[in-house]
């Protein structure tokens, strides 16, 4: 049995990242963004360049495993800069550390997460909520504890060189997801 060491670090500080690898056996990359906000926090930097660096360091420091968390559905959304950067990141990871396991989760949710909280806030405040593509986009949300169970399984069963899609038990359209959130916050749906 091992332990998890949580350290705050600037992901653009390669010297600091290298220091973390000296004591590591496994690297799990959970870093990702949904929107480009700040200088430096671009899809390319976060989803492509950083995973490439981490994979190279895994190889250089002879880590046992690299688990890279990507995103589900990116093969079908190639017109999206987000998806392109995720696919590029996956390719870079596998090129630099072929034994890596890539996890592609659907929307990950938990108590007080950004995704759920942001949508609940918007639903509560807006008189009308815009739904694109008639709300038919499908999701299979996965709870964060189920995703961590998957990560544990990958490590404990020595699963290498695989791409694993991670979904929850229920497939919902975006409209159904919003309706569930409305029920949670007690907001009645307008007819």
What do these predicted regions represent?
Residues 13, 49-53, 65, 88-89, ...:
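Conserved cofactor-binding/catalytic machinery of classical short-chain dehydrogenase/reductase
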Residues 121-142, 146, 150-167:
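A conserved pocket-lining segment of Rossmann-fold NAD(P)-dependent short-chain dehydrogenase/reductase
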